[in-house]
């Protein structure tokens, strides 16, 4: 009526159409159009928020206002909000990475593939050679003429080396430094090996001499006679004295018999 007349008369005052062209509504169901803000293009007015509380809800013919699909904006704040609040940073869902569980892929694949899992039996294995030794010492001969016995090397001398060393030992039981160097160079040994051989040879000679002396003392103790005891000589002396005293006695047959006893 009068309100509709004013609305149709002055279109410059209300540039936007108030009524939908396909609906014939009464003036009582009139609801003002949502205002538009040029500074905030992404802002949309929600009907019923700033309306008069005494007016109530609009009629059932009006539905709640929803923006069209073309007016939807992507995820994140608009340009106006970002300029107003510079502390907010827009990000897309593709930049978000969920927290990875520990042990899944924290290490590079090259490191994970190069380290094989160790079994409990492999972890308990003894990695050292000296821990795997048995109670029986093993003897191995190397190419340099040394024999490994338990904890030390024992030099294996040839027959020619032993012969030359024995000759030198019979000549002198204590070898000089000059002769030791000459003998080591001639036999292909070191001076330390020659010195150790002479030390062992002297120890062996002392052991042999000690054994010979013990055998000689045992033989001498078995061949010597035992000296006579003192009691035996005293008995022999008593027998001699008794025999000499008996020789001084006169036998009864030698005495003269008187005639009176005969008659």
Curated annotation (Swiss-Prot):
Region ranges (Interaction with DNA): 153-174
Residue ranges flagged as DNA-binding region: 150-209
Where's it found, cell-wise?
A: Nucleus
Q: Where are the transmembrane segments?
A: none
Q: Which residues form a coiled coil?
A: none
- Where is there biased composition of kind Low complexity? 214-233, 241-254
Q: What does this protein do?
A: Plays a role in transcriptional regulation. Involved in activated KRAS-mediated transcriptional activation of PRKD1. Binds to the PRKD1 promoter. Could play a role in the terminal differentiation of the intestine. Binds preferentially to methylated DNA.
Q: Give the UniProt family note.
A: Belongs to the Caudal homeobox family.
Q: By what name is this protein known?
A: Homeobox protein CDX-1
